[in-house]
Amino acid sequence: KRGKNKYFALNMLKSFTVSFFVLIIPLLLNLLMVHIVFAGGTYIPADVEMLKSEPNLFQSYSNPMFYNILYILVFSFIGGIVGSGATALAMAFPNRFILYPLAFILWYISTAIKPSIIGALTPFTVYPLSHYTFTIIFVVAINIVAVLFSFFKVTKYDQV
């Protein structure tokens, strides 16, 4: 028999792992197929001189594979964190009528702040990933707070 702490930690680990791999595997397969079909992705859909005026955009188009993989990893990591936050809330609030709005609010806050988390998940924009550092940290922080709140609620007050 496992204790409450171990049960909660294993569920968070499983949730993060499943969410992470559900996102990363199809994205990497898609990247591989696009790389094969389009012969390495050497086509640049814009004027090179225009790209030089936007250094961040030029840099991402100069190293497309690196930036694609970087954004896939960031997207999958954030998806894993959000999945863990939602799982933690599901453990703390078994009533679905409370759970669905709470999970939605967590994601809505992430998309409503400026700059939005959506921009951090979109490669090949004029903004570098560092432009979204605060947003990424904020999203991770609110989901960690959800996990910690749920941890204390589940382990201290609920029967598991």
Task: Name what the model sees in each region.
Residues F97-Y100, I118-A120, F134:
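Short, aromatic-rich membrane-interface segments at the entry and exit
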Residues L28, L32, S84, Y108, ...:
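Transmembrane alpha-helix boundary/anchor motif
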Residues S15, F104-Y108, N143:
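Residue-level recognition of pore/gate-forming positions within transmembrane alpha-helices
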Residues K1-M12:
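Interfacial "coupling" helices/loops that link adjacent transmembrane helices in transporter permeases
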